[in-house]
């Protein structure tokens, strides 16, 4: 798949037509975190459930200073008409308004630039459609996380919210989040921090799990 972004890459400052008008990506993001996520096609079952869940969680993302923006190879007109179905699926009034814009990428220019095309799934003209990609950008416009799902597997937007919590915490504190971590649970002290530094950084205390190797790398502390 041509194109694509690596962790640490700056987001391209592209211009695009969306359901809220024409945007320039960096201006849209401003000083916020941003999640750009693509879906294969409008008016399809899995995509409807995904964007419905994203809409439901939009207030939680907003609390975390995160802006959402979706993308597919469909037109703005299709996006707006489909938005009614998404709102109806959520049990809401079937309006054209969602809590985030959707990008019109009919020409696949952005999908190619960002490496979003699915090599397997095709449209009626045998052209590749967009895969289920998630890019999370920090306020510095740099890519902090990327996820790539095939068209047949819907994403878990609660998990995406969880990784935002992890990224925002670990970006400011010398900690890492362990498996299945959720906001408010204990975190792990990064190995580069000495015992003395850890004591100074974490006044709530540091617990070290004893291991057969004798190495003291499993160090936990309450979430700072």
Curated annotation (Swiss-Prot):
Q: What catalytic activity is recorded?
A: a hydroperoxide + 2 glutathione = an alcohol + glutathione disulfide + H2O; a 1,2-diacyl-sn-glycero-3-phosphocholine + H2O = a 1-acyl-sn-glycero-3-phosphocholine + a fatty acid + H(+); a 1-acyl-sn-glycero-3-phosphocholine + an acyl-CoA = a 1,2-diacyl-sn-glycero-3-phosphocholine + CoA; 1-hexadecanoyl-sn-glycero-3-phosphocholine + hexadecanoyl-CoA = 1,2-dihexadecanoyl-sn-glycero-3-phosphocholine + CoA
Q: Which residue positions does N6-succinyllysine occur at?
A: 209
The modified positions for Phosphotyrosine read 89
Site (Important for phospholipase activity) at: 32
Q: Which UniProt keywords apply?
A: Acetylation, Antioxidant, Cytoplasm, Hydrolase, Lipid degradation, Lipid metabolism, Lysosome, Multifunctional enzyme, Oxidoreductase, Peroxidase, Phosphoprotein, Redox-active center, Transferase
- Relay the activity regulation note: MJ33 or lithium;[(2R)-1-hexadecoxy-3-(2,2,2-trifluoroethoxy)propan-2-yl] methyl phosphate inhibits its phospholipase A2 activity. CI-976 or 2,2-Dimethyl-N-(2,4,6-trimethoxyphenyl)dodecanamide inhibits its lysophosphatidylcholine acyltransferase activity.
Q: Where in the cell is it found?
A: Cytoplasm; Lysosome
EC number, UniProt record: 1.11.1.27, 3.1.1.4, 2.3.1.23
Q: Which Pfam families match?
A: 1-cysPrx_C, AhpC-TSA
What outcome is documented for mutating residue 124 to A in this protein? In strain: C57BL/6, C57BL/6J and FVB/N
Q: Which residues form the active site?
A: 47 (cysteine sulfenic acid (-soh) intermediate), 140 (for phospholipase activity)
Role:
Thiol-specific peroxidase that catalyzes the reduction of hydrogen peroxide and organic hydroperoxides to water and alcohols, respectively. Can reduce H(2)O(2) and short chain organic, fatty acid, and phospholipid hydroperoxides. Has phospholipase activity. Can either reduce the oxidized sn-2 fatty acyl group of phospholipids (peroxidase activity) or hydrolyze the sn-2 ester bond of phospholipids (phospholipase activity). These activities are dependent on binding to phospholipids at acidic pH and to oxidized phospholipds at cytosolic pH.
What more does the record tell us?
The active site is a conserved redox-active cysteine residue, the peroxidatic cysteine (C(P)), which makes the nucleophilic attack on the peroxide substrate. The peroxide oxidizes the C(P)-SH to cysteine sulfenic acid (C(P)-SOH), which then reacts with another cysteine residue, the resolving cysteine (C(R)), to form a disulfide bridge. The disulfide is subsequently reduced by an appropriate electron donor to complete the catalytic cycle. In this 1-Cys peroxiredoxin, no C(R) is present and C(P) instead forms a disulfide with a cysteine from another protein or with a small thiol molecule.
Q: What is this protein called?
A: Peroxiredoxin-6
